[in-house]
Swiss-Prot record:
Pfam family, one: UreD
Molecular function GO labels: nickel cation binding
Signal peptide: none
Chain's role: Required for maturation of urease via the functional incorporation of the urease nickel metallocenter.
Organism: Burkholderia vietnamiensis (strain G4 / LMG 22486)
Coiled coil spans: none
Keywords for this protein: Chaperone, Cytoplasm, Nickel insertion
Main location group: cytoplasm
The family this protein is said to belong to: Belongs to the UreD family.
Membrane spanning residue stretches: none
InterPro entries xrefs: UreD
Protein's recorded name: Urease accessory protein UreD
Length: 291
């Protein structure tokens, strides 16, 4: 990022037109192949051509948002359905940038349904909240019978390269995982204000500008798995992490970091360890991450 880019004001005037992006994706199993059979988009959200670096059984898809960032008044809606027996790996090519608010909230809603015996790897790049960004995020994952899923959400407060400390702004977030009968397995609702004392509190963000949650859901996600992960979680001045089984079938890894690169490396290591256990599928770093 150039000096001019890092200090540019990237909010839109209140009178500017807001974006509404909507994307629907549907995956089905045809023989041994997972196929993207449905795609519908409105506005700037798109999906790139599906790839099969692991063979026909696992479909890799990259979700792109061409404008590159989300401003006040913008709304993004993603509805994704994995049919029975499918396996999809979904990611994004870069960080989602949430710009300085123009007086309106920017919103994102993600709803993912994973069919019976299906497998999901939800591996997006991080959210980057500019100073004075106001955002509302909603994430729902529904798991069918004998389904499994691994995913994460990573956040950076302020553009560190530009010296931002996120001195103003607000993030409202809601995440929930539900089982095949619609019963909540895990739910979390948070409202983080730039001046919230929890940002500096030891029981909160402890002064770290980067944080995230990795979740794994499935029959193999039990207390023993969480304990094995917890034993190798780092805890130092640059990266702090812990693992817990919040309910039978759901394991969480919480992480604080001084940089997004450190958090991403940690989440990738966790995913590489978890995938063979949770999905019973070997794990290799995505090619996209290496470009």
């Amino acid at each position: 990022m150039s000096a001019a880019d890092s200090h540019a004001c990237l909010s839109r005037p209140a009178a500017a037109k807001s974006w509404r992006g909507r994307l629907e994706l549907g995956f089905e199993r045809h023989g041994m192949r997972t196929t993207l059979v449905h795609r519908l988009h409105e506005g700037p959200l798109r999906v790139q051509r599906p790839l099969y670096p692991e063979g026909d059984g696992v479909c890799h898809a990259v979700i792109v948002h061409p404008p590159g960032g989300v401003a006040g008044g913008d709304r993004l809606d993603l509805d994704i359905a994995l049919g029975d027996g499918t396996h999809a790996v979904l990611t994004t090519p870069g960080a989602t940038k949430w710009y300085k608010s123009n007086g309106l909230d920017a919103t994102q809603r993600i709803d993912i349904k994973v069919g019976a015996h299906a497998k999901l790897d939800w591996l997006p790049q991080n959210n980057l909240f500019f100073d004075a960004a106001h955002a509302a995020l909603d994430f729902t994952l529904s798991l069918g019978a004998h389904a499994s899923a691994i995913g994460w959400d990573a956040t950076q407060l302020g553009r560190q390269a530009a010296g931002e400390t996120w001195s103003a702004g607000r993030i409202a977030s809601h995440a929930t995982l539900v089982d095949a009968d619609g019963r909540p397995l895990w739910t979390e609702r948070a409202l983080l204000d730039a001046h919230d004392p929890l940002r500096g509190a030891l029981q909160g963000l402890a002064g770290f500008p980067v944080y995230g949650t990795l979740w794994a859901a499935g029959a193999a996600c039990d207390a023993a798995l969480a304990e094995s992960l917890a034993a190798r979680m780092p805890f130092d001045d640059t990266l702090r992490a812990g693992a817990t089984c919040v309910t039978p079938g759901v394991v969480l890894v919480r992480t604080l970091a001084t940089s997004m690169e450190a958090l991403q490396r940690h989440f990738t290591d966790c995913w590489l360890a978890l995938r063979p256990i949770v999905h019973r599928v070997d794990a290799r770093p995505l090619r996209l991450w290496q470009t």
